[in-house]
Amino acid sequence: MAKLLKFSDESRAALERGMNALADAVRVTIGPRGRNVVLEKSFGAPDIVNDGDTIAKEIDLEDPFENIGAKLIQQVASKTKDKAGDGTTTATVLAQAMVEEGLRNTAAGASPIELRRGMEKAVALIVKGLGERSQSVSGDAIRQVATVSAGGDDEVGRMVAEAMDKVTVDGVITVEESKSLATELEVTEGMAFDRGYSSPYFVTDGDRQICEFENALLLLTDRKISAVADLVPVLETVQKTGSPLVILAEEVDGEALATLVVNKNRGVLQVAAVRAPSFGERRKAALADIAILTGGTVISEDRAMTLDKVTLEDLGRARRITISKEETTIVASEDSRDAVAERVASIRRELENSDSEYDREKLNERIAKLAGGVAVIKVGAPTETELKNRKLRIEDALNATRAAVEEGIVAGGGSTLIQLAGSLDGLANQLHGDQRTGVEIVHRALSAPLRQIAINAGANGDVVVEQVQRSGQGFNALTGGYENLLEAGILDAAKVVRLGLQDAVSIASLLITTEVVVADKPEPPAAPAPGGDPMGGMGGMGGMGGMGMPGMM
C-alpha cells in the first residue's frame, strides 16, 4: 500500500489536531457534573455514555494523519484503563495539556529531547509526593471512592462497598444485566482463577475483550487435547442441547483448537477453551474443586477415563462464565452450596494435618476461592441505553475501589495534583534551559483536570484553580464550594492518579519528539460495476472443506 508522509511542524500539527478532536470529546465527561456523549451504533439504538475509554475507542477520523494523533491519545485511555481500571478521562486531559504546551515550546525552538527529560523528572517527583500523601482505605472510605468514581452516584457506592464487605476486598465481584428495573446485589457460589482464553477468537464481547456465556456446560480434564477426534463426540452431544461449552484442560492446541475456533466463528457452537489453573498435582486439585462447584466430573488419566466416552452427566454446569485474556470467573448455581461446604470442610481437615508452610498457604487459597463465593451486582434500568451507561459506571467504581485498596487514597477533584504542583518549584530552580521548561510544562498541566471539572460544573475554570491554589482547599463541584475534600469524602485512588499522570507524560513526550509521520494512503472508492447491478453480481462463496467433524461443520 502506498504511503503518505508529513515532516517537522506539519506532522506535529496534524497529530495535535487529531489529539484535540478526541480529547475534546472525552473531557466533557470528567467530574460529577460531567456531560454525556452520544455514540451512533451500526445496529440498534445509539449509546449514551459517560466513560472516557468507551468514547475514545469509538473515534476514527477521516484524515489519516489526524487519526494517528487520535489513536496515540487513545493509548493513554486504554493503558490507564488496563492497569488501573479507571482514570481514563483524567489521563486524556493531562496528556492534551502537556502536548499543547510541549508543541508550543518546540515550535519556538526548544529541544524536544530536553523537554522530555524535564517532564520525566517532574513526574517522578509528583509520583513520590503521591505516595507520601496517600492514606490506607477502609470502612466508609471504600463507599466514598466508589461513589466519586461513579460520578457521584451514592447508590452505586453503597452497593460496591456492600459487595466488598460480603466477599472481602480480595473476593470476586462481577457485574451483569438484571431482568428487572432495580439494581440488586446477590452473593452466590463461584470462583475465579488466573487463566484466560486459549485464543482471542473466542471473544464474544469485542469492546471489553471478554468471552461470556450464560448457562454453560464445562468439560473438565487434566489431559492435553490436540486431536480433534477426541472432542467430536462431546461437541456433537453439546450441540444438540444448544448450550455453550467451556473446555478446561491442561492445554488445547493444534487441530483441536483450530476446529473449536472455526465452529465458534461459524456459529455452529458457542465454545471456548481455557487452560486449567495451577500445575501438576495442584492442577488436579483445582480441577476437582471446580468439579465440586459445577457438579461435573474430571476426565482424568488416573481414573482411566477417555474423552470419547464423555456424557452430558459428566459435564459441569455454571450459571455464567466470564473469560478475559488473563482471568476466568465461574458463577455457579445455588444447587452446589452443600457440596461446596463439604469440600471446604475436607480441605480444612487437610490444612490442620499439614506441616508445610507452602502447602498451608496453597490450601488457604483454595478455601478462599471456594468459600468466598462471588458477589453479583445485577444492574437494572428503564432503557437499554441507560442500563449500558450504568453498567459502565459500576465497573469503573469497582476498579477504582480495588485500586484504592492497593495504593491508598488521596483528596479527589484534581486538588491533589494542584497541591503537589507547588513541589516542582524547587526542581525547576535546580535545572536550566529546556529541561526547566519541561518541568514548567508539567506544572501547568497539573491544573488541567481541576479546570475542566470546574468548567463542566458551570464555573470559571481559571478562577477555581486560582482559589484552590491560594486556599489549599479543594473544589466541590457538586456544591460549588471549597472545602477539605478528604473530610468531605471526595476521594481518588492514588494508583489511578499515578498511572493517569505517568501514561499521559509517556504519550505526550513521544508526541512532542515526533519529526516524521507515515500514514497509509486512503484507497480510492471502487467504481460501480456496469450492467445496473451495484453489487456487480457476487459469485458463490465456495464451501470450506470439513475438518473431519461430521455434523459439526
From Swiss-Prot:
Subunit and partners: Forms a cylinder of 14 subunits composed of two heptameric rings stacked back-to-back. Interacts with the co-chaperonin GroES.
Principal location: cytoplasm
Gene3D superfamilies listed in its UniProt record: GroEL, GroEL-like equatorial domain, TCP-1-like chaperonin intermediate domain
InterPro entries in UniProt: Chaperonin_Cpn60_CS, Cpn60/GroEL, Cpn60/GroEL/TCP-1, GroEL-like_apical_dom_sf, GROEL-like_equatorial_sf, TCP-1-like_intermed_sf
Family statement: Belongs to the chaperonin (HSP60) family.
Enzyme Commission numbers on file: 5.6.1.7
Keywords recorded for this protein, A-Z: ATP-binding, Chaperone, Cytoplasm, Isomerase, Nucleotide-binding
Alphabetized HAMAP family for the sequence: CH60 (MF_00600)
Name of the protein this chain belongs to: Chaperonin GroEL 1
Gene Ontology biological process terms, A to Z: protein refolding
Chain positions recorded as ATP binding sites: T29, I30, G31, P32, D86, G87, T88, T89, T90, G413, N476, A477, L478, D492
Start-end of Gly residues biased regions: 533-542
